[in-house]
Amino acid sequence: MLRPPFSKNLIEFNNWDVIVIGAGAAGLMASLELPDNLNVLLLNRNTSKVSSSRWAQGGIASVIKPDDSFELHIEDTLKAGDGLCDIKAVEMLVREAPNCVDNLQRLGMIFDKNLDQLSTTLEAAHSCRRVLHVKDRTGRALVEVLEDHVESKKNILHCRGVRV
């Protein structure tokens, strides 16, 4: 049994198909990606809307312009990683990034724009302008969009103030 702080209600563990531990960007997105027919318990150690993801000011790197390429993004990432990167993981992340950006926009994330196109910046070890932002609050914008969708899903119960 689980009793979130400030609640008299107990939550039985055996009612859940999936338990997601952590409600930062990864936990929120994982919860949203699960099929609607599954009952999901999302456990969050924080009682307020706080997470490391929310404080992230950096942007999201993605190949979205014709003068860029997956190969160049992979090369930049591996160079910056100085031998610490898992090549297969880097390849997957780089190739999936444009789809993730599209998905985030469908969910309601509004990236900075220059006229009618997504605005990109040149940062860190990137050799092309490929970093997308929401002002200097990209992490906050990301988490807020994901939280809004999690809270609207009837199959997801988001419990705050739970230590696992």
Where are the regions that the model predicts?
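N-terminal Rossmann-like FAD-binding beta1-loop-alpha1 element of flavoenzymes
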Residues: V18-L42
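A broad, low-specificity signal for short, low-complexity segments enriched in glycine/proline
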Residues: M1-P5, I21-A25, H73-I74, S119
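Acidic/proline-rich low-complexity IDRs
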Residues: M1, N37-V40, Q117, A141
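Conserved N-terminal/central alpha/beta ligand/cofactor-binding core
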Residues: K8-L10, R45-V164
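Extreme N-terminal leader/targeting segments of oxidoreductases
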Residues: M1-V18, D36-L38
